[in-house]
Regions:
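Solvent-exposed alpha-helices and their adjacent loops that cap or buttress functional pockets
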Residues: 75-77, 101-102, 115, 134-136, ...
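Short coil/turn connectors at secondary-structure junctions
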Residues: 77-82, 97, 104-105, 137-141, ...
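Alpha-helical metal-binding/catalytic segments enriched in His/Glu/Asp
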Residues: 84, 104-151, 190-196, 203-227, ...
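Acidic/histidine-rich catalytic neighborhood of metal-dependent amide-processing enzymes
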Residues: 116-187, 383, 387-394
């Protein structure tokens, strides 16, 4: 074992209880995206956890969502940076029955314990270990902590684009897969609201010629679900539907929320063509339909540069004797936005656990230390190769 590896693992072993305490402190603050006060408290707690480090810290006040935080080292990097990304919000509202902290052997349970407060702790203690060994000062790191990732990062997306434009590479600290999966690519997402308009009337009197918005929309929904399986990797889900006023009135209005996922831009285009054709045909039959794009997240393609970054991480994982697996994830994250700028990015460097977005969410205790060591080693190795011009296939 070389000195760097030996000293790093010893440093993080000494910090194991501090990592646990930091994670518990963050998890006990309920910070659902719409709970601004809770997210603000997490932001302040993270700000304080970073205080011992040689970082310039700036809280970015927000009106609608929780405050955000940006922290940077002073290292120049020739104008290029290493971008880290992590979000402070969870899906659990302030009054969620899933609250508190529980320990059971090798596992910690609690809201956001892997999605993604565990990732925040992994990153913070990786930087602490590098600072302790005098290595952080050579890394031009910028870390953006955002507050509304769980609803698609509507406020922070421009910030990520701006920071990614200055970055040579990026690491997103969402949780790792249960078998050590790390993402080199992610599906893109298209969120739509499809609306139908009918003609209101008394249900007892309107029999022939009834124009029901709900009935029209239901027929369209069946066709939309049939798009599944028609293009590689494309999934379509109509997750919400509502309409009408009372049971004895023909519904004049109805709407449905549609979630579309695709591993390629071509897949999204295919779905849009299917939807456009369906709407034109149904409108010719007399239906009144309209569609609104609610959200859109670009595909994070598994590029050669992303794979080059993963190769560095895999090499450091072998030194640590922990498993990692290259993976293409179905869900979207802030990594998609970073990739849209063209910056090489890896996601899933946070701790290992399961059942995020549920009351069974847990993290494997030992993975906090392991993934912190992996991140620290990968930052050093990737930056040194980048400076030498040997990191990416195109130099």
């Amino acid at each position: 074992m070389d000195d760097l590896l030996k000293n790093l693992t010893a440093c993080l072993q000494d910090q194991a209880e501090a990592m646990r305490d930091a994670l518990k402190h963050l998890v006990l603050i309920q910070s659902g995206t719409c709970n601004k006060a809770g997210v603000d408290r997490v932001c302040r707690a993270v700000y304080e956890l970073l205080e011992p480090l040689p970082l310039e810290r700036r809280i970015l006040p927000q009106e609608k969502y929780g405050d955000m935080l940006i922290a940077s080292t002073a290292a120049g990097g020739g104008g290029r940076r290493i971008l880290l990304a992590g979000h402070m919000d969870t899906i659990f509202p302030a009054d969620s029955p899933f609250n508190g902290w529980r320990e059971d052997g090798h596992f910690f349970y609690g809201p956001g314990v892997i999605d993604m407060k565990g990732g925040l702790v992994v990153g913070i203690f990786a930087l602490k270990a590098l600072a302790t060994m005098g290595l952080l000062r050579e890394l031009p790191v910028t870390w953006l902590f955002n507050s509304e990732e769980e609803i698609g990062s509507p406020a922070s997306r421009p910030l990520f684009r701006a920071e990614a434009g200055h970055a040579a590479m990026a690491f997103v600290l969402e949780c790792g897969g249960i078998n050590g999966e790390i993402a080199t690519g992610r599906k893109g997402r298209l969120g739509l609201k499809l609306s139908a308009r009918g003609r209101a009337g008394h249900a007892a009197k309107v029999v022939e010629g009834k124009k029901s918005a709900i009935l029209d929309l239901a027929r369209v929904i069946v066709e939309l679900e049939e798009v599944n399986g028609r293009f590689p990797g494309v999934s379509v889900n109509v997750g919400q539907m509502a309409g009408g006023v009372v049971p004895n009135s023909v519904p004049e209005k109805a709407w449905a929320a549609i979630d579309v996922r695709s591993p390629s831009a071509e897949g999204i285009s295919f779905f849009r063509e299917c939807l456009d054709g369906l709407m034109k045909r149904r409108e010719a039959e007399g239906m009144e339909l309209s569609v609104e794009v609610v959200s859109q997240t670009p595909v994070m393609e598994a590029t050669a540069n992303n794979k080059a970054l993963f190769a560095v991480i895999a090499g450091e994982a072998r030194r640590l004797e922990i498993p990692v697996v290259e993976h293409f994830r179905a869900g979207a994250s802030d990594a998609n936005t970073i990739a849209e700028v063209g910056t090489p990015v890896i996601d899933g460097l946070g701790p290992i656990g399961e059942h995020d977005h549920s009351d069974r969410e847990y993290v494997v205790r030992e993975s906090l230390r392991q993934r912190s060591a992996l991140l620290a080693l990968s930052l050093i190795a990737a930056w040194r190769r980048y400076e030498a011009g040997t990191l990416f296939p195109d130099g």
